[in-house]
Amino acid sequence: RTSSSAASDVYKRQLSNSEAHYLSTGPEIWEQMGGRIDHFVVGVGTGGTISGVGRFLKEKNNKIKIWGIDSFGSIFKKYHETGEFDKNEIYPYLTEGIGEDILPENVDFKIIDHFEKVTDENAAIYARRLAKKEGILAGYSCGAAIAGLHQLKSNFKKNENVVVLLHDSGTRYIGKVYNDEWMKKQGFKLD
């Protein structure tokens, strides 16, 4: 059997995922922001959100920058920069929901301006900060998105509007990211 006929190929080929974000999430963001968007920042896993929303936003205003957040241990950033699928970039990481060791067909690398890699530790720390300082119990990939936002801040001008999409809830991470013992076991500092 070919990989495209195997059941495991479902994950790689979620093309309706991207289309759903093009038809719903992208227009919703555009409308809520009144079209005043300069940057869109989001974690990248299957690629559906960044590709669908990114395509919609670029069609509205091709000057909008699309920033993908990636994990160390994932291949997206290097592939985007070089076109090379480098197996040496692939190694285990903890952040769930972003990064890949495959190239999902959903990821439209042409509309993504830049990938920013975030460490597992920073993703966890920023998820915890969101809960502590903003009252948002967000997931691990959301922490990565916020950590990436902070790493990218020198790319944003003072009066520009930056939209960051937070994908998941922190309820799945109560025993991990939000657990001090888990953080210590990983060697992560407590914030």
Task: Specify the residue positions occupied by each region the protein language model found.
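Single conserved hydrophobic/aromatic residue that forms the stacking wall/gate
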Residues: 1-7, 11
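A glycine-rich, Thr/Ser-enriched phosphate-binding loop motif common to dinucleotide/cofactor-binding enzymes
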Residues: 13-28, 139-144
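Glycine-rich ThDP/TPP pyrophosphate-binding loop and its adjacent helix/strand module
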Residues: 20-65
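Terminal helix/beta-alpha structural elements that buttress the NAD(P)+-binding lobe
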Residues: 39, 136-140, 144-146, 150-152, ...
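Short glycine/serine/threonine-rich phosphate/pyrophosphate-binding segments
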Residues: 44-54, 76, 141-149
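Active-site/ligand-binding loops adjacent to catalytic centers
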Residues: 59-140, 177-191
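Phosphate-binding loop/pocket of nucleotide- and phosphate-handling active sites
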Residues: 147-191
